[in-house]
């Protein structure tokens, strides 16, 4: 631009800079930056964020800048792909001014050098490396900066370098005798620092022709670069001022580099600032020559490229802030941590936690780090610090501050702790700790909890303090903790705080000791006072969980406070916990008292702890009593219980050998054995043995576990114990429970009362009361009668009397327990409120039409009394998928991702082709007055009828036979005319295996033995213009094929609809679930092949469990929530196939339980229906017919658990000569009735609610009738048995003569076994039976 510009520039600004900036569109003036006279610099704002605007105010004479606009645009394009460079991204030339615009960066290298925490040597080398690399990239592209200095080097918060403010427009050469030119163009910060190469200053004798070669060179930039690098390593000290540079040019001054300890680094800078431009090293040679010397090898091989990848925004990022970029960086570093350690040559001595090591849940500290690529380990400081980790730490800390989701901040805590292992103790406290403390203010309680835990673990790693950090606890950490605890109300956070507080107290004491060694004055009293206040807040916290957490970690805190303060502060509060209604708190107190007893000493143990524990033996919670007995044994093993207390302790606790709880008895026995070990033979036989002898069946000589355990006397049964507690609570006029005062307390200072005895009676040393010593009132005698009715032997009354002090106290304490409210923490209590989002559902693509035909009606074939092949039926293609739109308008990427992942379950209402939903017929509960009149006898089928299905509205029913023929029958026609022919016939490819209707729809599925699956729709059209002779309108039925699928090479054994899906089982032991929309396999379960092929299956109403029956008589129970085979069972002595499994409706009850039973036929050769309890794996009820001998058969119904690998099959079962006498068909009738068909062609209606109301509906026994009775054969098993008796002669030929058994026609009864049963509820209640001979009989 010429040196004359400095002469033309005005000394005072005539117009405010904001006016010049306002000239620019979309840019708003913010504030001035610097005081330069050449380029006025301001900070502005545009739609991308903050920017820097440099304004060149043109002199009045005018100035043409078009040439420089082109040059700067060319420079921008050349440097566009250089990562560490920020050229001007916009250059504007106007009439009044020129504008240079670039992005704003908060910090320059000049500022960063003087900001804490100060740069470590590795960070300085990293900045220098990037700066040299940036200059090298520019020079390789033929572009030169012209004004490299620390003010023109920008730094991010993670120390990424950007070289900016390129100045090719500034004068190349300056007069050596006019400093004002230098000050105008280059000394913009008024620091009087000169980094301009000395050859750019011209002396008086310099020829003018030399000035005409107006071109920057790389050596000029290298000199400025060397000065900038030197300033970086000299902690801000500059190499040259302008006068010093003039002297340096003349050889009269040598800059001092003595502050740089590294010889290689010092030599590198000297090579860069050499007075002779030709001897200066190039940027490329500098990086090459000093590789592995000044700059570590991993700068070149890994770190530079890796940091560029982390710093470069991804393509999908939008907006200026790019918060999602911080999430991406954290995730990337988290997954790459193992690789990063390897590339940075970090070798940590990991305290590895093996996979089989189970860490107790209460041990929050020490933590175990589990990061991808890194062995799980407990953090510990490295013997050799690895400062290279600071570079990764810087970008991690920046990303953590700006991440959008709490999960990434928690991952950042993991990474901070991992990286802190590589750092020095000073760096841990200066770099890592402040960020963890800052997270205590995070809105997420998970992040707060992580911050507490990781902060504690980090402080545990510190073994050395600097003088700067000696007051870190009293002045920084403790005030933060006090503020945090006072504002934290959540139960979870207070639990975590209570867990880490003892560890922090111990660490604070360690820091205090280190501070004393450094000669610093730290007040220990104030330090302990702060922890005392925090501890008291937790000890009196209304939330039991916080107190429990503190108790589990109380020993470190006690060691900090010392014996006296532990007694005064901790123990005085803890003993009140035994009166707390929360049994978990009482248990936690007892578990912690052992270690605390060792610390506080024998005096506190005898005066406070031991008497309280003895009183706790009568706690209403049995788990508390178990823990008290365990504590007594452990205290005795440690020698903390003196001899004089041991006998009293045994006398008090030995009565508990009569307690029904086995853990209490075992705890008492363990205490007894522990005490015996410390006694001499004399003390044992003279003092101890008389106390415990009444509680053993036999005389014992060895007091060890193997001898004593088998000899313990039989305890009080649980039922008697519970009834005794009720007796103690309700008895008013009682002598048994009447107490009398004692003159003096017991050795433990309590229990100054005992129970009333008969006159002249006295309790022995053992405390055992004999039966003749027990007084009873008339009311007591009544209660004793109740005990006898419950199986109590009156000769054992002494056991209750001996234990009545315990029973009485337990009864009283239970009656005083307040009703506890639900302690669950709701989301609203945590400050999380629901947000309602509505979804709109629409088809993603249109449903295709029919495959053939020009119209919808053209595709329906009416098949009347004729057979058609499957190919003649129409096919419809699948419906489309479901597209969902929601009303959420926010931009949170995690919520959006969650909403996108929501899958809506397909419902059949979305598919019109399955027909509209129709109401199902209502099942009438109660006794059925069955007449037994044969209404219709149908014989159209020429093959065995294998399946029977009644439509949901009971307008028609379907039958399928072994020849593959499906027939449709009109119920109304049968009811009116008594005879009928099938209305529609469909031919399948092979034997029809099963037919099932889709729930509440006129669509059904038929499966064949060869694996063919077809879904049909039944269309019923009533024509009012055409009427039958009886006046009812004619109905036309037609069947359309909707879906078909073939399982090649498979044979189907059973089939059921599960909501909108179809489940089929095959002989290859598979259960396959099809999606009805497209008949694609949605899920597949492979049952163990060794259990046999699947014969039947069913699910519960909530579809949470599945029961499968197999050909080997095995029942396989699946938990569908986890898709796991949980159990496998079979009956004890037989392995007959399971024929049929039905899960009854929700209203079915057995033993007042519901939704856990299945009705099973098979598994045995008996004519029986089993009610099986899947929750217990046992038979609950057995419904036997007359043909079964109950006395011999009942033992066969014990259920055994089967291993998944079991393949044994009873050969006797496979014998062909064994007659099959099992139930042939079963169907539910309402929720508490079911019908079964027996092998002898009879039909029985079983009433599970009132067993005696069961009846035989169809029977060949003309002069006999059935009666039903039930008997409890096992505690968990009831047998309901049919008994056939001869009818009363007066009833023969009477009104009941019209039963089916009384008709004499040959076709009244079935000649072959019945294969299907159905009950029509309307218009008349009728019974449909089909058999293996192809006959259909309908009765009313």
Swiss-Prot record:
Membrane topology category: Lipid-anchor
Xref: InterPro entries: ARM-like, ARM-type_fold, Kinase-like_dom_sf, Prot_kinase_dom, Vps15-like, VPS15-like_hel, WD40/YVTN_repeat-like_dom_sf, WD40_repeat_dom_sf
Annotated lipid attachment (N-myristoyl glycine): 2
SMART domains the record matches: S_TKc, WD40
UniProt GO molecular function: ATP binding; protein serine kinase activity; protein serine/threonine kinase activity
Record-annotated active site: 147
WD repeats: 940-979, 987-1026, 1089-1128, 1133-1182, 1218-1256, 1309-1340
BP terms from Gene Ontology: late endosome to vacuole transport; macroautophagy; protein targeting to vacuole
Domain Protein kinase: 27-303
EC number: 2.7.11.1
HEAT repeat locations: 432-470, 570-608
Annotated catalysed reactions: L-seryl-[protein] + ATP = O-phospho-L-seryl-[protein] + ADP + H(+); L-threonyl-[protein] + ATP = O-phospho-L-threonyl-[protein] + ADP + H(+)
Keywords: ATP-binding, Endosome, Golgi apparatus, Kinase, Lipoprotein, Membrane, Myristate, Nucleotide-binding, Repeat, Serine/threonine-protein kinase, Transferase, WD repeat
Catalytic EC class: transferase
UniProt GO cellular component terms: endosome membrane; Golgi apparatus; late endosome; nucleus-vacuole junction; phosphatidylinositol 3-kinase complex, class III, type I; phosphatidylinositol 3-kinase complex, class III, type II
Location of this chain's protein in the cell: Golgi apparatus, trans-Golgi network membrane; Endosome membrane
Main location: Golgi
Pfam families found in the cross-reference section: Pkinase (PF00069), VPS15-like_hel (PF22956), WD40 (PF00400)
Binding site for ATP: 33-41, 54
Job of this protein: Involved in glucose-induced micropexophagy and ethanol-induced macropexophagy. Required for ATG2 recruitment to a perivacuolar compartment.
Family: Belongs to the protein kinase superfamily. Ser/Thr protein kinase family.
Protein name: Putative serine/threonine-protein kinase VPS15
Organism in which the protein naturally occurs: Komagataella pastoris (Yeast)
Name of the encoding gene: VPS15
